[in-house]
Each structure stands twice: as structure tokens, then as C-alpha cells.
Amino acid sequence: MHGKSLGSSRKNDSRSKIRQEKESNIDFDEKHDEYLINLQQRNRALNNSKAKDATQIKLQHLEEGFSLYLNGANADLRKQQSTQDLARESSKSSKIPDDGCSHLPGRRSQTAPGKIQRKAWVQNSIQIKSERGSRVYIGPNTKYSEDFESDDDMNEDQASDQYKYFTDSEKNVPQGPGKKRLVLDASDVKALRESLEISLCLQQDSKYSLDDDDADFVEEELIECETPELDSPSKTQLESKHQAFGHQRLLPGDFVVLEFNALDKKDGRMLTAKRKDNSEFYIPTKPVMVKNKTPRLKSSSFSSKDSFFPRPESRQEILLPTPRRSISENKDSRPSVSTVVDAINNENEAITRAISDGKTEKMTSGPSGISEGVVTKAIEKINLMKISQQKKLLKVLQDIDNDSSTNSNSEGEILKWDSVYLDPAVKDVICITVEILSNWGNQYYIGLTEIQFFDLKNEEIYVSPHDVDIRNVDVPGDPTCLVNGKTLTTKEHFMWTCPFHPPVQLYFIIRNATKSGDFDISKMKIWNYNKALSDLDIGAKLVKIYKDETLVFDGLLAKGSGNQDFDYSNTIDLHSGQIKSSSFISDQFSDETQISNSLGASNNIELKHQSDGLVYTSEQLSSILSEGSNQAKTSQQKDLHFENNTKGLRTFQDEALNKSFQHLALTSSSINCQEDITEGEVGIKMSYNKEEHFKINQSKDFNTMTAELQMVSATSSKEPPPCPRDDNDLTVTDQLERTPGRKECSSLNRFPPWLSSSSNFQQKSHNQPTKNHLNASSSTFTNKRSDQDINQFLDEYVKSSNTYSNKNFKNCSQSKMLCSSSKMDNEDDLENFSNQSSYNSDRPVSGRRKTVQMQDKSEKYEGASFHKTINPVDTKNLRPRWQNDQENNLLESWTSLIKFNKSHRGRISNLEFEGDIFDEFLQQQQKAGKQSDSTKNGSSLMPKGATEIHLESEKEEGSNFEIPVLPYGQHLCIKIVTTWGDRHYVGLNGIEVFASTGKPVEISRIRADPPDINILPAYGKDPRVVVNLIDGVNRTQDDMHLWLAPFSPGKLHFINLDFVEPCRVAMIRIWNYNKSRIHSFRGVKEVEIFLDNELIFKGEIAKASGTLSGAAEQFGDTILFTTDDEILQAMSLFDETFSEELKATETPTEHEIDSLRPSTADSIKEERPFTQAGLSEKLQSNLTDVSENYSDKLPGIYSGKCLLLNFTMTWGDPHYLGLTGMEIVGRDGKALAITLDALSACPQDLSILPEYKDDLRTLDKLIDGVNITNEDTHMWLIPFASGADHTITINFNKSEDIAGIRFWNYNKSPEDTYRGAKIVYVTLDGHAISPPGGFLIRKGPGNCHFDFAQEILFVDYIHEQQILEKQLRSHSKCMELATMDYEAPLMPCGFIFQLQLITSWGDPYYIGLNGLEM
């Protein structure tokens, strides 16, 4: 019985185990299915994450086909397929049953290689022992697929084997149902090739115009686009094939068969066997077969072995799985393909018709023959192919059509189409390189003033300073000076200089900002170095100019003028390579031809009339200047152009030149004319060899020589001196006289050359009637100017020269020489040089010089002659008188300048031309207008010089705008035009406006457009807002008090200020942006200020220095609208800068010095001298007396019983607020006694929180006296909530006088100091005594190395300024001002040195230092 029960129990146990095993198997299968589903989803997500964008796909295309060691040492050792292998493979491919599997819509693609074993994936059979004791063998599934999708095609291996390559032996086998063949002859091949070239060019051009929305067209094309594929060969096979029949030529009887695949075949994405990220795309190929009826081509090397292209065995055709993302059929992967195909079809139809009309009868050898539309059909098939396949086909067609002439024509046509379609239509940049090879004599430096570029429309091209580079130099200087727009200037900081080590290269990048199609540079202008006459040798001389690495100019540049009145530019035509130097005085006159004819007729000198001057031949000029010359000997006839830097220089006849040089050299001085011929540029240097004791520097008195040559030439040719032929010859003085505010220069050292050139002329006007002189002049020269105009001109000139009428003839001649800064040691030479036209008698000379007889036999001006003999005795006193006159004139000029500076300088709105871009614009406009007028009127209107244009523009500008006196209004608008160089930001430190009462104007509202940089996406809470401009803190570099806004050149930038009430504005002070020396270039430069829409100022604001030192002029500009002394005196009382300057200039009197001197010990008094660094008892007693006398009137001291402190902000901690200690400062500066009963807080401490019941940081720690500590047991801490009140209330027993509060902020550690209080509001008996923004409490240091107490005195926030307050504040101990009532110890020794920083340079909240040295 017992055995039966045991047996039944065992059966039940076995049954339960079997049931459990079945259930576990079911659970395992379910879990396994869930695992497979999850794994499949993960694989799909991984594939989606590996999807590539268009850029990655393009890179993938570029990286395809590369393999390592392609041409290595073992490249030829690979196994070569034999003929048996080829036959075996061809027979195997022919035995494949055509069961229709190949015609399925899509074939299953295996995405993972089967031979690669996954890591940690067990594929071998395993043996598992079950619970019943039996052994179970489990093996992997042989049909496992990685993507776990259903296997719809069980015959994919057989189907994949079907796609094999066919040899040439199969060309006669009937083509399958999915194949399409076209037979072309030679003419068809040529037409197809030409059409395909055009098609590819069009498609390549359309590729550039695709939108960003279609960036994924490559992926879509590879997956969905159903295209017929031409079986084109690979690259290496094409090369071998090309070598096979490269020496042959396609004859008219030869045919080419194009075979296309089925239309329903889709592109499959080929994944390589290796696990790579960059997959390759497989394109099945077939060879292009050439049929020929003649046996010649069959016996050639183009055999079946050469034409067979075996598929690489390492690559297997593995297609993507059938399920793909659905893409709309109507969405083409390339939107422009359809339009391009239509255009190509239309064009090809026309080409096909043209070819078919002129084509002879063709021979047909294919199974279906050749029809007239075979080319059209081929093009339709080819258009459906991919671009890469079309390119391969084009290469094959070019190889087949091997005619040399055809190939050359096709290549030329391809280049033509590439230039039309593929090259960019717009040229973006042009690179200009200016290579400086030499200068005008300076051994150390090279310099230029300005370089400008002009386009084909003769408009100036803007060049950014960032696009200028100086190369081949160690110290490049400031390249921005080359493109700063300062052309006519003598200021050195506007010019570019650097150490000269030739060659120096200036590199410019000229950008096509307008994106115009005809962008090019027609010419460029170069202004040479122009600081002063003595520094003109720094200017560049021999230069080479390269345009995009092509030499376009090689020649000389003219020197500068040494002044800012004349245009000294060099215009270089980059197309012709010619240079034209601007003269100082225009030399293009209407009567130039007549002068040249009259001068050339008498001397047989060939004069060529050109647009830029008169031309001599070298042989004739050398004969003129051969006397005394050692170098001017040439035998060839060369054209020598007199190119110089003055506008008065002209070529003269040989007699005039000979006599002028005789006058210059006097007796035996030799003249050398050195010719510098450099590639069409010929410069003539004239140097004077001093035989005795004088030498003339040609670079300095070149202008004077020019004027003298003119005078001598006219005199020696028996003609009276000519009158000016246009406005620019002698009317420069007239211009100066008619210009307001322009005074006549009386300094002989700076005497203008145009005045010196007419000194003799002026003297003659006193010695003979003016009318006769004018008649003689007008009879000689055919001048367009009337006699009446000349009379008027001379009358004005004589009136303007009355200052010099009382001087003798010698002084006039001396001043003429001084204008060119030349120093003569012999006064006889000076006399002869200046008075050459006045004497016809022999001049006595001293020394070894011989007398020179004047060639003039008659010097009569309509019956009036000059005969004056100079006594040699008169020349003895010449130098003393010359020195006295020079000193007197210099003193007069200096005195005049000082008077002008005192009386008129502050009243001129536009003092100088430099720096005003609006004046430059007006000058250019006036130049253009006057040039156009002169062109219309012909030769009757002469072009005006640069000086007259400058003076007239200055006059017009000055007359159009004047600074008003005390303008009245309420709305002030500041328009910012430019900055000091920054192209992105503009900023200011502050704006101050003072009324006519002397007080600052109260501003109700300020706004700006753009408001600040917070409008930019990268900014959001930047403190540099526009309100900071009127916060009163101007001399600072703190961002909390600056204003910064985005700046866009050419756009409008405004700052608008609204006054509380209308007033008369007396002064506006603008504090420019002063963040640092670099950031100071963000400051405003040119501004226009409007008051109630009335312009009250237009000009330039000085750039800030970027430092905190210096006077107010170092931080901006002050604009005065009045010179009334009473208003200025009233403004000085409220102007902080004036008080600071006054303090800096104050010097203590002797009594003050004695009272500040510390007392010392003597034998009379027994008291010990006071040596402690503090206040003496005498000063303390005086302070006590003063305090008692003025106790009721002291500002900043408040009386009350209930003091309330409200803390509203911490230094960053959002949860806790704390203090270390606190004291209430009384009247005498001592702390008031506070008991714990009088002290209360809300919240009390941390005990209100459940977890801080027994916390020691309670309220009584504030008054325990332990303040300099890091222990939080002596600190007070409470919970903090932003926006809530956190108060401390102190109730005194009686009314107390309170002067301030002393705080020790929370100081547990540097990290915990952010819990310290930051803002506190103080009220006494309900009355607020703190400013509207509260008191700012300094953050604790986090250590206890020093006393970090902060004393807040109410008196510091009182704005009343009275003398009594200043005295009390100066003696107050709390201010801790320096005093001399102590003796400094000698070499103090200690561990801790304490520096008490009393004040900052304007910042009320922060103070700092850069460093300390001891």
C-alpha cells in the first residue's frame, strides 16, 4: 500500500515536471520572440541613425573605388583567369534556368555578410542536459537573417547567380525580353557624342541650382529611381580597351551596338563584405561591342579576352531589403532633371534632323537595321541613366571616335561649354600686389599716404582695412592708413610708414561687394608720402604692380608736394600700364599748342602736343644742356617726359633753359642733367655741382626752380613776363585772399612758392604802369581771360601784397629763395638769381668766378626799361638784414597764431579738412561738377586746382552750418554716423548736458535705436544699456556704466534724450567708449546733434584713451554753445571735471604748509612729539568743538528710536542669507550700544525650519563682538526667499543720532560668502534714509586675514555741497583722509601691511588694482 502511494506520487511529480517544462518552453519561446522583435526594432533604429545626408553621400561617392596598395609590388601577382575559367563561367551562366525569378519586382537583399561571425554569438551546436536527465542538442538556424524579416525569396542565391557578365561570344545570342540594343554607325556615334557632351554640361550646370530642400536626392535616386543601365566598363578596363584600338580609326562601315538593361530593374545598394561605414554602390556593366563587316577589325587585338570584363570575386551582389520608406512618385530626386531632359530632347531632335538630312544612305547589319531616329532613341535611353554612367559612355564614345580632328574639336567645345556653364559668372575678388623696390633717397623708411582703386565705371571701390597686408617686412606699420581715405594731408598719423628693406610688398584683396558681372579694376591712384618737404624722400619711387600675379605696371611714382593744398596723386591705368602724375597746378591750357609752336619754331625743337605735357627728344635736349654736363650724352632719339610734382613746370626752348641755368649757376657753376630711363618712364634730375661754396638741394627747391624757369624763359626770349593763363597759375593768392579766415603767411621759412614766384612780378608792378604790362602780356599770349579780369586780378594782388611793399628788392628775392628752404652762402648769388630779369649790365663777382654777360640786348616793356646797378658794398649788409627780417616775421607770425588760437579757434565749426568724411564727399562732388562744366564749355573754362576746390568747399561748408549760440529746446537727438574703426559695435560712457543756468539738465527719458546689444541673439542680460549714459559715472571702465549697441555702417543710429522742461543748452559733454585701449575704437567718431529737429552740431568726437588717467579731453569732447563768462562760471560749480582739475592745480600756501608740518621736539617744550599715524589731540579737540557748534546742522546724521533694516538680495545664494556682525555708528563715529532685548528679526533664524531646531547661528551673534572670524557659530543665518522682506529691527530706549552702519558680511568660507547680504534698505522711524536703490554691501573675503568691515555713512550719499560740509568731511575720522601730522618710520618691518583704499576713479561700487610692488 505504501509502495503504491509512492509510485503514484512519483508519477504525479513527473507529470508536474513535464507540465512545468512545457510551460517553461512556451515562456522561453515567447520571450525569445519578444527578444527577436526588440532586436529587429533596434537594428532598424540603428540603420535609421546611420542614415547619411547629402554631404556624407558625396564624400562616400568620392571615397569609393580606392584600395590600398593598388600599384604595389604584388599588384601583378594576382591570379590571372585562364580561358578555361572563362569558358566554365560562361557555360555555367548559360545553364541557369529561366524560372522567372529574375523578373520579380524586387529581390531580397541580405544586409549582413553570412561568413562573418558576430562577436559573442554562438553559432556552433551545443549540448544541454535536461532535468529528466536526457541530453538535448541545439544547433543554429541555417536560414538566419540579421534583419529578422520574412524570407519571401528562397532562391536568392540562384537568382543572384543569374546576373553574370556575357562575353563577346554571346553577341549573336538572341537578347532576352528585358534587353534593348541599338546599332549606330560612325556618323551616329559622332552626333551622339556631341549631344551627350552638351547634355552633361547642362546637367552639371543644373546641379548647382538645386535647393537645400532636395539635399537628399542622392539617397532617393539610389533606392527608388528606376533607370535603364548601360553596361559600361570600369576605368582600368577602359584604359586597356583604349590601348587596344587606340591606333585604329572608326570607318564609315563600322557599327557600334549599345545594349541597355531592362526598365524594371531597380538599383541595388551594394554593401562590401567588410564592415565599413562607407558602403559602395554596385553598377552592373557590359562591354560596348563594335561590329564590323570587314575582317580587319576582327583580327585586331580587340578580342574576346580583351573585351570581357569579369566581375571582381571579392564583391558579391547584395541588395537592400524590399521594404523601404515610401517616397512620393511625383517627387523627383532632382527637380531640374525633367526640364533638362526636355530641353536636351528638343535640341537633340534638331541635331538629329540636321544630321539625318545631310547623311548618306547607311549600311544596315543589325537584326532590325538602323532607322532615322536611332540617335533620338539612344538619347532618350541615355537621358534616363545616371550622370556617372553618362560620363562613362561619353568617354567610350570619345575613344571610339578616335579621329584627331574630331577629338580636338570636341575638347574645344567641352572647354567652351565648361566656361559658359561651369565657371562662376561673377568674379568675387581681385588680388593686387604693389611691390616697392626703391624710395626717393631715404635709407631707413618707406612710406605712402593713400591707395585707391576704381572700377570700370570710374567709381571708387571700398577696400576693407582687414584686406590689406604688408609683406616682407619685420615691422609692417599700420596698414589701415593706406585705405583710410586721407589723401590730401600732411599729418603723419594718417600715413603709412615702415622700415625699408626692399622689396616691400603691399597686398590688397579687392572684393566684388556689388556682385556685378563686369567687376574689374580699371585704374588705381597712389598718393606718395607727404609729411613735409624734408621728408619726401621717404616716398616710394620704383614700384611694380601685379594684378592676380600678372605684372601690369613697372615704373616710377612722383614725389609728394609737402603740403595738403595740391593733388599729388599718381593715376595708374591697369589696362594700358600707363601712369599719369597729377600736377600741383594744371598745365592743360587752351593755348598750349600755340605756345609750343612759337617756342619750337625759333629753335627747331620737336614739340609733341600730348594730354599730359610737351615732349622733347633726347638728342635735342642733350644739346641744350650739354654745356658743363658729364652725363647727359645720348646718341639715340628717345622721348623724355618732364614728369614732376609741380603744376607749374613746362618745357621751354633751349635758349630759355640755357639762360635760366646761367642765372642759377651765375659764373662757372656746372649743370648736370641726369637721365633716369626706366621702361618708358623718364625722370630728369637736375643737380647743381657747387664749385665754390654753395649747393642747391633739388628735392627742396624744385618748386622755386619751376617758377624761376618760367620767369627767365619769358624774359630771355625778349618777351614780357606772361600773365597767368588760367585761374591756377597765379590766382592761388587771389584764392587765399578771398578765403575767409585765411591769413597771409609772413614766415619766410614757410613762404609759399606761388608767392615767391611772383615777387619780382610784384616789384615790377610798382616800377611801371600796370596797364602797359598787361597789354604786353596779352599781346604775347593768346589768353582767353579778358584784360578786365587781369586788371582786377592784379589790383587785388597788389592790395594783398601791401605788407611787403615797403621792403627793398633784395629782401623780396631772398624770401623767394627761402620758400624752398635752400640755404645760400653768397648773397650775390641770391641777388642774381632773383633779379635776373632786371639787369642788363655785367655783375661784379668775387673770387674765381667769371662774369656772365646777359644775352638780352633790350629789356623794354612798352618803352619802360629797368637799369639798376648793384654796388658791391650793398651786399655786405645783406645777411644781417635778412636775419633780422626773418626773426621779425617769425615773431609776427607766432604772435598772430597765438591771438587767433585764443580768440577764434573755439568758434570755428569745421577747423580743418582732415577727418570729415562729409567734406571729402563734397570735394569729390565739386570736382566732378567742375570737370563736367569745363568739358562742356571747352577751352574757355579752365579746370580749377585742388587748392581752390578745397578752399571753396571749406567756405561753403562753413557758410552752410554754424554752431548756434544757446539753442533752445526739449528733445535732444544724437545721430551717430561713424565709429573710430569698429565695424560691428558702437558705444559711449556717458552724456552730460548743461543749461544756460549752469546746472545739469534733468533728463526724463533716454532711449536709443538700436537700444543695446541685448537685441542680438547671443546676448540677453548684458548690463551695457542706454540708461547708463546718464547715471553720472563717466570716468570708468566698468560694464555697469557703459552703453554698447550693434553698429551697421550706412544705417541710422540714434540716441534721444527728453528733458524735463525746455531750456537753453550751454554745453554738451560726450564721454566716449573707454572700456580699454582696444575697445576704445568702438567709440563714436562723427556725430550730428539735433535739438527739436534743428541741427546744432556736426563734427568729430575725440577717441577715448582707454585708460583712467588724464584730463577730461582724454575721454571725449566738450561742445560749448556759449562763451559767456558768467555761464561758464556757473557751470564750473556743478561740473565735476572742473573741480577735479582745480584740485589738481591747487598749491598750498606757506601758512598751510606750516600748519600741516608735524611738530618736533625742542629744548623748550617737554612734550613728546606726535609720531603716531593718526589725528593729533589738537585736531581731535578742534573737530569736537566744530561738531558741538554745528551739531544741529550736520547733514547725514539722523535722529530716531526705531531703526529698520530690510535685506532684499544676496550675493548669489537663492536659499540662505547671513551676516557676521553689525554695528550702528553714532555721531562721534563710535558704535552705539545695542542689547538683545532691543534687537528683533523676521525671520528670526534657522530655527523656523524643522531640521534646524538647535542651530547656533542665531540673532544674538550679530552683536557678540566676534566679527573677524570664519566660524559660523559667531554668525547669523536665516532662510532667504527672493522678493520677500528680511528685516532686522532695533528699538532704542531713547532717540539716538545715527551717522551710519558698519557691516561684517557672511564669511564662513569663500564658497559660503555668496550667502552674504548684498542690498539693504534703511528706514528710521518710518522715513527712508537709504537711496532708491538701497545700500550695496560688499561680499565677504572668505578669510580673516584683515578687517573686512564696511562702513556705510549716510553723509556720503548727500548731494549738497557746502563749505562747512567739506570741512567736516575732511576732518571726519571715518573718511580716513591722509594727513601729514605724523612721522613715517624708517624701513618699517612687519608681517601684514594694510592699504586702505579710500576712493576710486568714479566707480561707487567697486575698486581694484592691477598690482603691488614692495
Curated annotation (Swiss-Prot):
Compositional bias, Acidic residues, is annotated for: 147-158
Q: Please indicate which superkingdom the organism of origin belongs to.
A: Eukaryota
Q: Which Gene Ontology CC terms are recorded?
A: cell projection; cytoplasm; cytoskeleton
What InterPro entries does the database record attribute to this sequence? KATNIP, KATNIP_dom
Q: Where is the composition biased (Basic and acidic residues)?
A: 10-32, 86-101
Composition bias of kind Polar residues appears in: 832-843, 924-940
Major place of localization? cytoplasm
* Compartments where found: Cytoplasm, Cytoskeleton, Cilium axoneme; Cytoplasm, Cytoskeleton, Cilium basal body; Cytoplasm, Cytoskeleton
Q: Which UniProt keywords apply?
A: Cell projection, Cytoplasm, Cytoskeleton
* Region of interest: Disordered: 1-32, 80-116, 139-158, 712-731, 756-783, 823-861, 924-943
Q: Which Pfam families match?
A: DUF4457
Q: What does this protein do?
A: May control cilium integrity.
Entry protein name = Protein KATNIP homolog
